[in-house]
Amino acid sequence: MEARAQSGSGSQPLLQAPRDSGRQRGEPDPRDALPQQVHVLSLDQIRAIRNTNEYTEGPTVLPRAGLKPAPRPTAQHKHERLHGLPEPRQPSRPQHPPAHPSARASLARSISTVSSGSRSSTRTSTSSSSSEQRLLGSSFSSGPLADRIIRVQPKSELKPGELKPLSKEDVGLHAYKCEDCGKCKCKECTYPRPLPSDWICDKQCLCSAQNVIDYGTCVCCVKGLFYHCSNDDEDNCADNPCSCSQSHCCTRWSAMGVMSLFLPCLWCYLPAKGCLKLCQGCYDRVNRPGCRCKNSNTVCCKVPTVPPRNFEKPT
C-alpha cells in the first residue's frame, strides 16, 4: 500500500514536468494571472462613446447664386477624425478617452450645411409657387372681360363685297320657260329624279330599290349565270336578262323558264319591276321642278336688270 501511495504521489511531478519545461523556475504562470486581470463592469459603468453618427451626408441641393457652397472636409480633417476616434477597448482600461474636438466641429459643420441647404430649397419652392399664383391671379382678374363668359361665337359683319346680286349667267340659266306649263326647260330642271339610294356596309354595298328586287326575286343568280356563260365581252345581256331588244332573246327566256322551275321566286320579278316603274314615275312627278311636256314651245323670259343696292353704313 505504501508503495502505491509513493508511486501515486510521484506521478504529479512527472505530469507537471513537460508543462513547465519551457519556463524557468520562479516565473509566474500567465494563465494563473488571467482571472485576476479581467474585471466585470456593472451597468452604471457602461456608457455610450458618442450619441450621433459621424457619417452625415444629406441630399444634394443646388446652391443659390448669392450663397457660396460650404467647403468639404479635406484630407487633413479626415486624418484628424481618424485620430480622434477612441482606441480599441482593452480589458485593463474600462474607461475610454473622449473624442477629439476637431471631429465634433466637422460633424456640426456638415449638419449645418444640410439644414441650410434644405431651408434654401424650401424657400425657393415657396417663392416659385407664390409667383405662379400671383401671375395667374393677375391674368384672370385683369381687364373688364374677366367676369364675362363668351357662350356664342361672335359673328363678323357682312362686307359690301359679299352682298353682291346674282350674275347674268345665273339669271339666264332659268330664263327659258315652257309656253304651256310655264316651267323651266333647262337641262338641270328637266332631268328625271331617280329613287333615293345609299351605300351601306362601309360603302361596299349599294342599297337601292332595283337591288332589293334583284336579290329578293333571285334574279341575281340569273345575271351571274349569263355573265359566266357569255363569250362576248360587249354583251350586256347579264345586266338586263329580260330585255327583248338585245341578242339571244329566245335563248335567255328559255333559260329563265327552266330556272323558274327550281327558283319559283323568278315569277315575281316582272310584277315587282312594274311596281318599281310606277313608284319611279310618282317620285319624279313630285320632285322634278322642270317641264315634263313632250311637244311644247320655248319662251325666253327677260329678267329685268335691277341696279345694285348700296350697302354702306349710315353715318
Swiss-Prot record:
Basic and acidic residues: compositionally biased ranges: 20-32
Instruction: Give start-end positions of Low complexity composition bias.
Output: 109-140
Q: Where is the SPR domain?
A: 177-291
The post-translation modification note in this UniProt entry reads:
Cleaved at Pro-144 by the prolyl endopeptidase FAP (seprase) activity (in vitro).
Record-marked site positions (Cleavage): P144, L145
Which residue windows does the record flag with biased composition (Polar residues)? 1-14
Pro residues bias spans: 88-100
A cellular-component GO term for this protein = ruffle membrane
Chain intervals for the UniProt region annotation (Required for interaction with CAV1): 118-315
Q: Name one GO molecular function term.
A: protein serine/threonine kinase inhibitor activity
Q: Which UniProt keywords apply?
A: Cell membrane, Cell projection, Cytoplasm, Cytoskeleton, Developmental protein, Membrane, Microtubule
Q: Does the keyword Nucleotide-binding apply?
A: no
Its job: Antagonist of fibroblast growth factor (FGF) pathways via inhibition of FGF-mediated phosphorylation of ERK1/2. Thereby acts as an antagonist of FGF-induced retinal lens fiber differentiation, may inhibit limb bud outgrowth and may negatively modulate respiratory organogenesis. Inhibits TGFB-induced epithelial-to-mesenchymal transition in retinal lens epithelial cells. Inhibits CBL/C-CBL-mediated EGFR ubiquitination.
Q: Give the similarity note.
A: Belongs to the sprouty family.
Quaternary structure (record): Forms heterodimers with SPRY1. Forms a tripartite complex containing GAB1, METTL13 and SPRY2. Within the complex interacts with METTL13. Interacts with RAF1. Interacts (via C-terminus) with TESK1 (via C-terminus); the interaction disrupts SPRY2 interaction with GRB2, potentially via disruption of SPRY2 serine dephosphorylation. Interacts with PPP2R1A/PP2A-A and PPP2CA/PP2A-C; the interaction with PPP2CA/PP2A-C is inhibited by interaction with TESK1, possibly by vesicular sequestration of SPRY2.
* Protein name as it appears in the record: Protein sprouty homolog 2
Organism this protein belongs to: Bos taurus (Bovine)
